[in-house]
From Swiss-Prot:
Keyword hit for Hydrolase: yes
Protein name: Acylphosphatase
Known EC number: 3.6.1.7
SUPFAM superfamilies listed in its UniProt record: Acylphosphatase/BLUF domain-like
Family classification: Belongs to the acylphosphatase family.
GO MF term list: acylphosphatase activity
Length: 100
């Protein structure tokens, strides 16, 4: 995780997480959407042509970090082998949380 002096606990952030493994066709995007909505996050989970799922989530850093922990928890549908994350300031261009 990269942090800058401008990161503050209450400032919204944007999490981009590429989820590798057996994560398509197993209810993974639905599960991710449910966890994100429970946390009050906005964003989406989208299947990639190469078999990964791309998760974008915006909200308070603590809530995004919790979603990231859940993605890595081993309790997801399917089988997650790797999650590659990146962080940036929230763009504020998302509403709700969608499966795409």
């Amino acid at each position: 995780m990269s942090e800058s002096p401008h990161d503050h606990a209450g400032d919204p952030v944007r999490l981009s997480a590429w989820v590798h493994g057996h994560v398509q066709g197993v209810g993974f995007r639905w599960w991710t959407r449910s966890r994100a909505l429970e946390s009050g996050l906005t964003g989406y989970a989208r299947n990639a042509p190469d078999g990964r799922v791309h998760v974008i989530a915006e909200g308070p850093r603590e809530r995004c970090e919790r979603l990231l922990e859940l993605l890595r928890s081993g309790t997801t549908p399917g089988r997650v082998s790797l999650v590659v994350e990146s962080w940036e300031p929230a763009r504020g261009d998302l509403t709700g949380f969608e499966e795409r």
